[in-house]
Amino acid sequence: MRRGPALLTLAVVIALLALSQHAGKQTAPLPDLRGRTLRAAQLAARDAGFRQLAAADALDRHRVPVLGGNWKVCSQQPPPARYALTTPVTLRVVKTGEACPRR
């Protein structure tokens, strides 16, 4: 019986499992994105390492924020703090010139 290839395969599998578990636990500080344009906020979040970004109309008018420079961030979920890089980030926005809704 040849143990060499089987042990090598087992070692590779264990190493890959360890790496995948470590990758899911990487964290970074999510900055305060309020008051920025949607585009600037998205760039700042991406620069911090966050990739799961969404934008929603803060006035609940069902508008789709398309041009990031024409929208202003009113709030974010989750709030600024340290999170896993896999954490989804939602930015609630209004069109530039509109007032943010009261909480």
Show where each model-derived region lies.
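Ligand-recognition elements built from short beta-strands and adjacent flexible loops
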Residues: 1-103
